[in-house]
């Protein structure tokens, strides 16, 4: 693949989308540097699982592809936070960024730079980036108000402070992944629930009869074992698009045996309807 990219990139100077996802990583820095040298209009780039790549690739993309909107570097484990921060300073149009498994790159330092520069960011995957803490997530919350999807699964250092900052500042948030974030407590859940109520008037005014449809539509709190049913039920009640019912699971609570009593509105309706059915005579 590396030689193929080296030979073809100079011939496709108007390329806007390039998917280089690999099962057996072959891509090297010189290929990405060639892409950056010739494909200046590139908007969507997938380099996932290219663990041979180093910061050289990020530096090249920063200078050669400033119009990037979507970048997937999940599984690129050799990138550092310095390289990622450098990229963020030049690629300010980024809206979709996948950093899943980029343990060395996704640090609070890098996230602060992303929050400062990438203010159009809408989707960010930080799954299993175990060095991410509250400072980084709060920087995102303050700097990226249009954030709609954030995956923090496995970010074991974050606490309620991260969720509270997101609830208060990211009014467009639709999907939040908190799997195995075991420092999360009821305080975070109530902040999400209350943010829905608190922001209703503001959103109504700003949208002028186009009230923001649904709020949270996906929430993963699996293995967040400190949470209690009343707090999670409050979130479920505040966001009608969160479902626990069969076939529509969007509130994921697996591994939390104490949360089995939490139900969405349609699950309650189904239960009441079933209870109202006449029982057969014996």
PLM regions and their residue ranges:
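The conserved beta-strand core of Leucine-Rich Repeat
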Residues: 1-282
């Amino acid at each position: 693949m590396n030689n193929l990219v080296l030979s073809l990139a100079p011939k496709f100077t108007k390329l806007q989308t390039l998917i280089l996802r690999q099962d057996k990583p072959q891509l090297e820095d010189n290929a990405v540097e060639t892409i950056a040298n010739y494909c200046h209009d590139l908007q969507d780039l997938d380099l996932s699982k290219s663990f041979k790549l180093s910061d050289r690739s990020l530096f090249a993309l920063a200078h050669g592809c400033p119009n990037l909107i979507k970048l997937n570097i999940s599984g690129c484990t050799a990138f550092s936070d310095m390289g990622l921060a450098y990229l963020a300073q030049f690629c300010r149009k980024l809206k979709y960024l996948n950093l899943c498994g980029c343990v060395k790159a996704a640090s609070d330092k890098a996230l602060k730079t992303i929050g400062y520069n990438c203010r159009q960011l809408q989707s960010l995957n930080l799954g299993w980036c175990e060095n991410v803490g509250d400072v980084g997530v709060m920087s995102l919350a303050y700097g990226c108000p249009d954030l709609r999807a954030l995956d923090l699964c496995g970010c074991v250092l974050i606490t309620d402070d991260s969720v509270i900052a997101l609830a208060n500042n990211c009014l467009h948030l639709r999907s939040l992944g908190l799997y195995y974030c075991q420092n999360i407590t009821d305080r975070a859940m109530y902040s999400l629930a209350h943010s829905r109520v608190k922001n209703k008037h503001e959103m109504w005014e700003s949208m002028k009869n186009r009230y923001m449809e649904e709020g949270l539509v996906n929430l993963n709190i699996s293995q967040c074992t400190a949470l209690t049913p009343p707090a999670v039920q409050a979130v479920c009640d505040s966001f009608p698009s969160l479902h626990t019912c069969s076939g529509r699971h969007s509130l994921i609570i697996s591994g939390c045996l104490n949360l089995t009593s939490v139900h969405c509105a349609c699950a309650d309706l189904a239960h009441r309807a079933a209870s109202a059915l006449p029982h057969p005579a014996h």
